[in-house]
UniProtKB/Swiss-Prot annotation:
It is found in: Cytoplasm. The active site is at 127 (schiff-base intermediate with substrate). This is Transaldolase. Its EC number is 2.2.1.2. PANTHER family: TRANSALDOLASE. The keyword Secreted does not apply. CDD domains: Transaldolase_like. The lineage of its organism: Bacteria, Pseudomonadati, Campylobacterota, Epsilonproteobacteria, Campylobacterales. Transaldolase is important for the balance of metabolites in the pentose-phosphate pathway. GO terms for molecular function: transaldolase activity. The keyword Cell inner membrane does not apply.
């Protein structure tokens, strides 16, 4: 399935030096993503950073973070570079800008350009959240020929608006990261069993349709947050359900490994628009509106990344 790509949503130094290379070499993945929460988890809990942190003592916390994070990003970039050179639609690693800059477009643009210039790798994507100021940042980076990963996309309306900007302005590869499982975690406790474990996939499918209206060879939907939040679901539930043409799925290791044991051999056919609308109508009988939920989840996602980043900086 050449039009579906699997990426790894995990970063940690020991992993990059070992299992990450194995996954690439056996053709299991062709890209990777990182975020502030993943870096916080890796750097604060892994022993592989401690010697370097000790040597950096006395420097500012953000400087320590960037030294560690950029080293990991460069290592991932090098490992993925042969894939990028073979096919420039694949082989990317993503790095997110400082989450505390999300409401300041000018500072976000400056930081994104600085990080991209410092890394100096064509297969690095700069992650920009789909916040209010994010639109200006996305436009500026697209015009500057910087590969972009627009993250924390929950709303189909926002997904379509972002795709429209990128279709006009993107000169390099761009992905729109549609978050999936958080919808089910939010909505499932509020609905009967026959409606559970569906909201995330249905909302993501509507986002996919919105993006597809503007997608070209540079722009793809990337399904993110595809690890299950419920023990009742198969670990690879969201990967299998969203195996669409011209899409990418970035998955945590547990979901990734489960999927690789029994991967899809054919693309999934997305639900029809009429089926999506019927489901949304049924949700409304339970006083649930997916667009309102999307706005809530975006706010929570922005806060969560700030909290993780703050926790990481304080650990230094």
């Amino acid at each position: 399935m050449q039009e579906f790509s699997l990426w790894c949503d995990f970063i940690e130094r020991d992993f990059l030096e070992n299992d990450f290379l194995k996954l690439i070499n056996k053709g299991a993945i062709c890209g990777a993503t990182s975020n502030p929460s993943l870096f916080c988890e890796a750097i604060t809990k892994s022993a592989f950073y401690q010697d370097e942190i000790a040597k950096l003592k006395g420097k500012k916390a953000k400087e320590i973070y960037e030294t560690l994070a950029l080293k990991d990003i460069l290592q991932a970039s090098s490992a993925l570079m042969p894939l990028y050179e073979k096919n420039p639609n694949n082989g990317y690693i993503s790095l997110e800008i400082d989450p505390f800059l999300e409401d300041d477009a000018i500072k976000s643009i400056d930081e994104a350009k600085r990080l991209f210039k410092t890394l100096n790798r064509p297969n690095v994507m700069i992650k920009v959240p789909a916040s209010t100021s994010g639109f200006e940042v996305i436009s500026a980076l697209a015009q500057a020929s910087i590969p972009i990963n627009v993250t924390l996309v929950f709303s189909p309306k926002i997904a379509g608006e972002i795709a429209q900007i990128l279709a006009k302005e993107a000169q390099k590869r761009a992905v729109i990261s549609v978050f999936v499982s958080r919808f089910d975690k939010e909505i499932d406790p509020l609905v009967p069993k026959n409606l559970q474990a569906q909201s995330g996939i249905i909302n993501a499918t509507e986002c996919y349709y919105q993006i597809s209206q503007h997608a070209n060879k540079l722009i793809s939907t990337l399904f993110a947050s595809t690890g299950v939040k419920s023990n009742s679901l198969a670990k690879d539930y969201y990967i299998k359900a969203l195996c669409f043409k011209n899409s990418i799925n970035t998955a945590p290791l547990e979901a990734l490994n489960a999927y690789l044991l029994d991967p899809n051999t054919e693309y999934q056919t997305p639900l029809k628009i009429a089926e999506i609308e019927a489901f949304k109508k049924e949700l409304k009988t339970h006083n649930i509106d997916l667009e309102n939920t999307a706005q809530k989840l975006l706010k929570e996602g922005l806060i969560a990344f700030k909290q993780s980043f703050e926790k990481l900086l304080k650990s230094f």
